[in-house]
Amino acid sequence: MRIFEFQFNPKAKKDRFFKTFSFEKILVGKDFTTNVYGIGELSNALPQNSNLLDKIAHLVSEEYRTQGKGVVNPDTVFKKALREVNNFLATEKKQGNTDWLGNLHLVFVAFSFFPRERKVTFSLAKYGNIQVFLARENQLVNIAKGKTLESALVG
């Protein structure tokens, strides 16, 4: 007799890390508020990089938190936060920490709400092999195709 075992909840791997974060009303301007969300995965990671995703999330949150109420355009803050993440990753690479190359997958999304104008804008950037789909009129569209941390999608 053959016995098959199905695992719907595979055991956690010690070399794979996931991080989700959300910062509600992290940026409050004169005419808008901004929420930032992110998802990250680091696979095949060494123990020394177990907190890499936490460091990236902290960088993003600090970049937003240090902005004052004088911010006019939330997209510039988003792009500045991405530059900080890029600089951090470049520094890690220069220091010889290259374990994350090819194993880091991130997506950042920022929604800015403009109540007076009754509009919402979003900014999106990704790094690595991650896909972001938009469901619209019974269709799924990969809106992050070809986008990277260097080329943010704003709309």
Could you tell me what each predicted segment is?
Residues 1-64, 97-125, 130-137:
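N-terminal entry segment of metal-dependent catalytic domains or homologous docking segments
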Residues 57-98:
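Helix-loop-helix
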Residues 69-71, 103, 147:
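Intrinsically disordered, low-complexity regions
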Residues 137-143:
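A short alpha->loop->secondary-structure connector
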Residues 143-155:
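Conserved, helical-rich catalytic subdomain that frames metal- and/or nucleotide-binding sites
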